[in-house]
Amino acid sequence: MVMLDILSNALIQIKNAEVMGKRQVTIWPVNKLTYYTLRVLQRYGYVGEIEYVDDGRGGKYIVQLLGKINDIGPIRPRYPVKYREIVQWEQKFLPARQIGILVISTSQGVVSHIEAKEKKIGGVLLAYVY
C-alpha cells in the first residue's frame, strides 16, 4: 500500500481512536512533519505523552489520548496563508473564536495559528483541531 499523505493518515488515526474511546493510539508510518504537528497538539493539551518506538522499519509513535478532541483533520489542499488572512481561515475551519487551533507550517517551524499571529508570520495550513 502506498501512503500518499502521512500527516493525514496520522490525524485520521487519532480521530478514529478518539471516537472509539481509546486511551492511546499507535501511529505508523511517521515523518518529521507528523512529529512536529503532534508536538503542537501536545503543547495545547489535546494529546498527552508522545513516545517514539524504533522498530527498524521507520519507527512509530505511541500517543496518549486525553479525550479532549472533538474533531481533527487535515486541511487539503495545503493552502498558503498570510498572517493577515489567518482570521478568515479560523472562521472557515474552527467552530468559534478561542476554540481550537489551526496548525501552520512556517519558516520558523510548525506552530499554531495563535503563535503565527503573535510572530506575524504566514505559512501553509496543515490541520485543524478542536
Swiss-Prot record:
UniProt lineage = Archaea, Thermoproteota, Thermoprotei, Thermoproteales, Thermoproteaceae
Pfam families noted in UniProt: Ribosomal_S8
Q: What is this protein called?
A: Small ribosomal subunit protein uS8
Question: Of which family is this protein a member?
Answer: Belongs to the universal ribosomal protein uS8 family.
Q: Does the keyword Chloroplast apply?
A: no
What is the recorded function of this protein according to its Swiss-Prot or TrEMBL entry? One of the primary rRNA binding proteins, it binds directly to 16S rRNA central domain where it helps coordinate assembly of the platform of the 30S subunit.
Q: How does it assemble?
A: Part of the 30S ribosomal subunit.
Q: Report the GO terms under cellular component.
A: ribonucleoprotein complex; ribosome
Question: Which gene specifies this protein's sequence?
Answer: rps8
Do you know which Gene3D superfamilies this protein is assigned to?
A: 3.30.1370.30, 3.30.1490.10
